[in-house]
Amino acid sequence: MSLIAIKSGAVFISDAHENINRRGFWNFLNLIKSGKIRPTQLFLLGDMFDFLSYQTEFFANFFSPYIELIDELGINIEIYYFEGNHDYNLARFFKNIKIYPIQMQPVVFQTEFGDSVAIAHGDIFLPFFTKYALLFLRTNFFLKTINFIDRLLENKISKSIFAKLERKRLDYIIENFYHIAEQRVSRYNEKIIIEGHFHQGKIFNFKNKKEQIYINIATFACEQSYFIVEYAKEKIRLVRKEIRGQNV
């Protein structure tokens, strides 16, 4: 099976963490709809919402305009959505885009010149207990049970989650992130690794046998930045752009 090529003009965006008072992702999507941003492909690297799953009615209803707009854009644009630790069980929302749950990540693509590219949200390679505890929190049984209780409590659980996540600090520095990235690339066989999740916005070129490149996409929620793919001298590069100052 041939790998999907990442096209020149593709756009990467990660960690928008959209909530009641954070609307940058909505503006970004509408800039695409209006034609002011014209991606050849759109890669959503997860945590696009502070919380969203198919089984949680409060969040599904709150973000329904986003869901409809993303699916509408997917009619004419290849959209690849990598579920994160804040947004999962999304497949039943969409007809026109490709969803990659955490169990399928990383997903391997390739550049236009044949270099392999592994893409993931980033919350993978977890310790055994943590991995399966988080998978349980994503089960249909657990989420439907919580949703049932939430309805009885007039959405107090969902509103509490929203309020707590809204206060969470998203702009932080991980001091030893180079070494964390170095350990992560050792788990990959691909030439280029692209992840979100860590909120660091760093690129590292490792002088290992594979000469791997690690790219951590900057947090859209903090920097309002997205990244456009360009090719030069048979190499891929991600060019940073900002939506600040762009009118929808």
Regions found by a protein language model. Give the residues of each.
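Active-site-proximal loop/helix segment associated with metal-binding centers of metalloenzymes
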Residues: 119-180
